[in-house]
Structure formats: C-alpha cells, structure tokens
Amino acid sequence: MSTPFTLLAISDLHYTGLARQTLQPAMTRGELARILLKKVFLRLEHLNVKPDLVVLLGDLIADGKDREATHDLLALYSELTRTGLPFLVIPGNHDRGCDRFNEIFDVSPGLHTFGDYGFIVYDDTFEESHTTLRSESALKLTETIAKENPKLNLIALQHAPIYPPIKSHYPYRPTNATEIMESFQKNGVVLSLSGHYHKGQSLRINEGVYYHTVPSLVEEPYTFSLITLEGRKVEVQEQSLKLAFPSIVDLHCHTEHAYCATTIDTATALSLAKTLGVTMQCVSEHAFQLYFEKKYAMSGKWQKDTQEVQRVWETPSRNRMVNYRHFAEKLRSPYTKIGLEVDLYDNGKLLLAPEDAEEDLWDFLIGSIHFIHDFIPGKTTQAEAEKLFLRDVEQLLHLPIKVLAHPFRFFTWSHLETPKHLYPVVAEMLADSGVAAEINFHAYQSDADFIRTCIEKNVKIAVASDAHAIQEVGEFIPHINLLKQAGVTPKMFPDVLFSFT
C-alpha cells in the first residue's frame, strides 16, 4: 500500500521582473508572477496543506535570452527555497536561451525519487517552428526506468501537453505524442503532468494513464493544482487565486507608510486587488505610526503622554501624517477609498489631531485596540483586562468609526484567554452603535461563534485582509470559510457584508 503523497503543480509564470516587458498578450500577467507565487504558498498555509513536492512545469520567465533572465530566475528560485519544500523545475520553450537555468534549479532529465514515487523529468526539444519532439533516447529512458524501478509509481513531467489533442493552429503537443502515450501505457506510468497550454486541461484517463495539463498561474483565474497521489489513484483539486464571490470590500489594507508593513506596495496592491476581483480596495494606515517615531509609536507610551502628543500635533508636519494625507488623497478613486486605523489615548479620546479629524478628509475610520490604558502585562488579571476592554470598546463606539478592527485580538496578543462570554455583549454594543465587526486573519484567528452572534443581531461584517505583505492582498479564503461556518453563503454576502451603499 503506497503512502499518500501531496503534489503542488504550477505552470507558465512568464515572469518579467527585471527583464524587459516582452510583447505578451494582455491576459498574461507575467509582471505579477512572483507575487502570485507568494500567494500560492500563503493559500496553502490557510488550507493547512504542506505538499511533499512542488513542481513547476516550465516557462518560468518570458524570455530566456533577455540579459536579466538569470536574475528573474534567481528571484523565483528564492521564493521556492524559502518555503523549505522540495521542488522540481522543468524548462519550457520560453526558458530557452538562459545558460544558467539547469544550474540554478539543479534540474536534470531522468528519475527523481520521492518516497514511493518516481518523477521522470523530460527536457524535450523545441524547434524554431514551435514544434516539439521527444527524442528516441528519452522514449527509451521511460522503459529503462520502469524496468529498473518496478515498485515505484511513475509520474511523467514535461512542459508540452501530451493528451488530449488540442484544437489550435499552434502546435502545443509533441509531434510524436502518440508514441509518448504508448510508452507511458506500456511502462505503467501513473500520471503525466504538463503545462504550456495556458487554459489547462482537467484530469482524464486514457489506457490506464492519467493526464493533467496545469493552467497558467498568470492568466485568469490564476490557477494552480493540488494533486493527491495514493498508489495509482490520482485526485486533482484546482485552486484559483481570483475571487469567485461578489461584494468583497476590503477597508483594511496597509501601505508602505506603516512601520509594521513588510513587502506591501500600495500601487501594486491596488492593481493586484482589482486583478483578483476585489470589489473595492481601500487603504488605511495606523494613525499612531504616522504621528510618532517608530520606537515610541510601538511602545504605546503615547496613550498616557498627552504632552508629547500635543507637541507632535503642533508641528507643521505632525511627523508623517501630513505627507500621508497627500499620498492617500492621490489614491482616492471610485475603486479606492481612504481611511485611518485609529486608537484611543488620554482615557477615551481619539488619537486624531483636530486638523486630521475634518469630516471630508477620510472616507472612513477603523477603530482599533492595540493598547489599553491601565493594562499592565503580567499583572492585570483576566477579569480586570475584560473590564478595561469593554470600557475601551464602549468609548470607541461612541466615536465616528465605521468598523471595529480585530475585535478580540488584544487578548491573544496579551497572552490572555479570549473571553467568549463577552461575544453577546460586544455584539449588542456594535448593533446599538451601527458599527461593523471585522473578520481579520492577520496574526489573529477570528471566531465563527462571534461572527454568528453579530449576524444574529444584524451587525454588518467587514472582511479585512489587514495586508502588511503584498501576498496578503486579495486573499479571503479563510474569511469566506469562516463565514460559511457562521452560516453565511456567498448569496447572502450583499446583505451581510459591510459596504458603503
């Protein structure tokens, strides 16, 4: 009995990072390939899936002859190695011309063994006419490997699709595809995996051999394949990065102005969000990080230091706030609303200078509890912390905020128990104030019980990426799954989720 084996298959990234932007079809988003690859691994984290092997099935870059091709390949190599997962990379026709491809990915034709499975790498010849051919020696290689490894379940990896035939003027399949199929069938190959044909072809079986063509990661709907192998049993689950659900308004996405941001880039984030089907992508930034220098901001001391707050507010720039206002205003569009994530200071006041609190400056304010005045880590008891928390929630909800961010995250970050008995209390407070509750998975685990309680009280739900890294933009699978746990189907989204209408 073979051990189950999970395979992540990705194809046709056509990455153009440092390389010049070649004349690609408008539908091919090669410039986003590295980000989409990051998003694939983030999706796997959310699905709690750790593949046994990652395979990339060719055309990693758009032009192997470009002078920057090597650097673009190295960028993709870094994304693969940082995962700690084993991987195999197959060259495609667009990778030709880069002399260092095989060296970078340590790829070689032939057998690569992982557990009970033998992966046969084929490096087929691509002609100038775009036709491809499997050599006689490569056909014999299949037979040799099968005879020498009778207990291995064999998986064939190549760039060009083998089966089924494709109706196209472009010669996607090898000219000797029929011979290849006969070789697979005679030698007991379990599965043939290919790329090249960007639309992909779903799993099918012919003469006892499974065939699957993996779609391009950089064309809608930005798909990769999760494949489960168990002996000769094969199952394929296709995962798309593009949202298939309506009414996703993301109010909570950070910018490069945040001290806690990592790889976020606002211009790229807005383009990515639209590409992935986010209905409206807004930006919001921590007010306390804009007003104060990093060390002081992250200490939370400003909550009690009214003298320092006033000193900063009296300076013309208010540290970085004025610059952020100019930046945010240029982002405002029908697709993008601008806001701030605001905290309390001085026993219940909003940390917002009078000049920054004018009504028409911001489309929305998000209320957050990152710090609690009078809370002393390690000394304040659970019961005392709960009282302080309710005090601050009540104070926030009397201020002009539209959403309460990551409602109970303070307890998690303070190493306290999440007070689930307060769910109905906070939900009632939100209902009375007309403020939405946020679903947030940034360093936090939202609870379906709380969301369900809020919905029962007609509290709107705001889904939030709370993106600090670029790959977090547009990733709402955990939010959607949580809503399902709370009894909310996608058809109910327009009625349940927060919007500006």
Positions of predicted regions on the chain:
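Binuclear metal-dependent phosphoesterase catalytic core
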Residues: 3, 144, 201-246, 467-501
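N-terminal active-site segment of His-dependent metallophosphoesterases
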Residues: 1-68, 244-269, 275
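Core catalytic region of metal-dependent phosphoesterases/phosphodiesterases
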Residues: 32-109, 113-114, 298-326, 330
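Charged catalytic cores and adjacent phosphate/nucleic-acid-binding surfaces used
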Residues: 244-251, 255, 398-400, 414-501
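Extended active-site neighborhood of metal-dependent phosphoesterases/phosphodiesterases
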Residues: 66-148, 153, 176-186, 206-213, ...
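His/acidic metal-ligating clusters that form di-metal
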Residues: 37-53, 130-210, 391-396
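Active-site environment of divalent metal-dependent phosphoester hydrolases
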Residues: 14-21, 62-65, 93-100, 127-131, ...
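An N-terminally biased module of ancient metal coordination in phosphate/nucleic-acid-related enzymes
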Residues: 244-346, 383, 414-415, 420-428, ...
